From Swiss-Prot:
It is found in: Cytoplasm, Cytoskeleton; Cell membrane; Cytoplasm. It is linked to Cerebral palsy, spastic quadriplegic 3: A form of cerebral palsy, a group of non-progressive disorders of movement and/or posture resulting from defects in the developing central nervous system. CPSQ3 is an autosomal recessive neurodevelopmental disorder characterized by variable spasticity and cognitive impairment. Sumoylated. Membrane-cytoskeleton-associated protein that promotes the assembly of the spectrin-actin network. Plays a role in actin filament capping. Binds to calmodulin. Involved in myogenic reactivity of the renal afferent arteriole (Af-art), renal interlobular arteries and middle cerebral artery (MCA) to increased perfusion pressure. Involved in regulation of potassium channels in the vascular smooth muscle cells (VSMCs) of the Af-art and MCA ex vivo. The modification Phosphoserine is found at residues 42, 64, 402, 414, 423, 442, 461, 585, 590, 673, 677, 679, 681, 683. Pfam families: Aldolase_II. SUPFAM superfamilies: AraD/HMP-PK domain-like. This is Gamma-adducin. It comes from Homo sapiens (Human). Belongs to the aldolase class II family. Adducin subfamily.
Amino acid sequence: MSSDASQGVITTPPPPSMPHKERYFDRINENDPEYIRERNMSPDLRQDFNMMEQRKRVTQILQSPAFREDLECLIQEQMKKGHNPTGLLALQQIADYIMANSFSGFSSPPLSLGMVTPINDLPGADTSSYVKGEKLTRCKLASLYRLVDLFGWAHLANTYISVRISKEQDHIIIIPRGLSFSEATASNLVKVNIIGEVVDQGSTNLKIDHTGFSPHAAIYSTRPDVKCVIHIHTLATAAVSSMKCGILPISQESLLLGDVAYYDYQGSLEEQEERIQLQKVLGPSCKVLVLRNHGVVALGETLEEAFHYIFNVQLACEIQVQALAGAGGVDNLHVLDFQKYKAFTYTVAASGGGGVNMGSHQKWKVGEIEFEGLMRTLDNLGYRTGYAYRHPLIREKPRHKSDVEIPATVTAFSFEDDTVPLSPLKYMAQRQQREKTRWLNSPNTYMKVNVPEESRNGETSPRTKITWMKAEDSSKVSGGTPIKIEDPNQFVPLNTNPNEVLEKRNKIREQNRYDLKTAGPQSQLLAGIVVDKPPSTMQFEDDDHGPPAPPNPFSHLTEGELEEYKRTIERKQQGLEDAEQELLSDDASSVSQIQSQTQSPQNVPEKLEENHELFSKSFISMEVPVMVVNGKDDMHDVEDELAKRVSRLSTSTTIENIEITIKSPEKIEEVLSPEGSPSKSPSKKKKKFRTPSFLKKNKKKEKVEA
């Protein structure tokens, strides 16, 4: 059989007509550097790269705008067809999967959506009638109703929780009568005014309980600072409210409550006298009110603060009931001094964050950190609270240069536009813009520090590098302390006429509309202060004791002579050669006249010789620097001074012939002798001072008069 099998094997090559099958190595060049790199790569690393490529494709599909638009259209269509159909839940799970992380930092469980009714059922509802922030407040209040139901504090829906959403109009939202706390959602809450009239019915046809709402309305009208009121009457709180001793400071929870007020409640607060008595009992700062033989009411400026006080008062009442039952009376209990321990308990708790705000960058309000933890619990159970978490739970990965990337202490918070339902896909698309806004609003300041560099061998290098560090000095922080503005009339003075405030506001708006440029508002404190102008740095005062000013050399000239002198100066500045030649000819004629007259020494008296000697000595003792500008002698100032002296000398004596020469720049000599002859060669001729033409005319006039 083996021989038959061996005979059946074909060992000849296939015929040439059979097509050649392409192999893997025929498509790859073994000398390709990319192929060599992949061949030398480890299998695990190659598998990781393949998984990254696959995830990249999925991410591109999920982040594509076309896929998002199609998914949003499908969700809107399913919501129009019916309430929570199966297709809508499936699409909602896909939307949650696309969102990489929910608000709390955890992904929502996919199978829990069908177990409970979601709290935030407003994405498809009409929210155009809601005021700013009402959508978020409705979600918070509905979540609080669910917490009260889970804690077992609900008493057949006879306990109520209300929240004021508008101080201007005093609008309050509350659950309607007949609706269980486990059914509370953001859409079925009823909005009423301060007197109980319905403003927004919500998604149900149920009415509110006016008797149960009356304590809430009385508290809101008495305390403008209160925003949330929680009223419960559980077994423990009702038992303590019937005790004459009230809430005893025997536990830490009772010390966290602060001052407690007590009021004899008769079942309603419709009468004006009862409201006045409640206002006297409640005071301006009390946060816990015990209704005698009825229950307990907790107040708060925020919903989180009110829950903080109602949780602690419920726990304190339970402790007190158990302690009295075990001890057999108040005398057997160790009662603490509240005033002694107030600084360690109530003051620390009232500062916010349960006492964890000490030097941290994240500032928590009273009860906020605990309330966020409970909201995360509800979200993980599938309640879909819609709560806007202030701080995420999961810590972000450290970035490059994270020592200066410190998150802002307080960021600007703005409510979203409630007129259009916000899709979770659009919310994720705006993540980058929100991250940018987060750092732009940071009030942190940094300082430049020079840090020595480290060399390769581990030693400290003399070179330094610049590092930015956060400024620890609180006085250098430019952001300041943020102030929460809840009331639009917060900065309006008390006892002001509202009509005047409205008129002033309208005037300011008109000024902004017409773009008027004014000096701004005038301060009432600085209006009567007279500010002296600072003295100028340069003060010019007349000094009577100082030396007299030099006389004006042109004071004795006429207007015609001044005009002629100005024209002469202009011709000199323009470089006209004719003017120079004319002046030289005038000087030559005057010098020749002087020479002809000085050649007869018998006509000069002895008195003139003495004057000549004095005049020559005075000129010889004076040094005149020679300045050359553009190749010419700039001797205008010297000429003016010499001309003055010559004119004075000519008026006091009968001297008519004076000759002044300059021999060298270092020394000026005047030679007044009859041997001076102007008939020498021009190259050896001594340079003479040229006198102005108006002086020559004066000399001619004097000669004629003489």
